[in-house]
Amino acid sequence: MDQSEALQILKSGRSVFLTGQAGSGKTYVLKEYIKFLRGKGKLVGVTASTGVAATHLDGMTIHAWTGMGILDNLTKKDLKKIIKKKGVSLRIRNAQTLIIDEISMFSAGHLDIAEEIIRYARGTWEPFGGMQVVFCGDFFQLPPVNRCGVESMGKFAYHSRAWKELKPEVCYLTEQYRHKDQ
């Protein structure tokens, strides 16, 4: 599909996995969608799995946004401590859309942790607390780094419970824009 089709699907409010090869315009579509949402007065959680990717969108890491930091598992004690952080819980409760760029670098286990924090903070058991979620990235890149040896931390995010429950619509961008500009 082209960028305008993907934008229309995003504007419908559905949760989406935005993907395509390098140069297909994923970042452009995200930036346009963020601009659209903010123009409507919507609060957007703009995140990425890495700090570098987050800075490209003027966002923050998903680890910081959810307050999960470097946790590889989540205890009830951890969850309560995270939710007590006023900035984190307000940010999560007030966001209407969550964007996670470079999803290929975020493991299944970490996505489940982030999603559990979001549900708890929002007080609802709907996937991601009922907010629209936009995953963006290309799973043909390297898998997540597994620092701790836990199996779920080495699996791609689409293997997570959170992804399977959300059932995001796939928007595969097929047109090459980077090469057209040269």
Language-model features: locations:
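Conserved ATP-binding/catalytic motifs of P-loop helicase motor domains
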Residues: 1-182
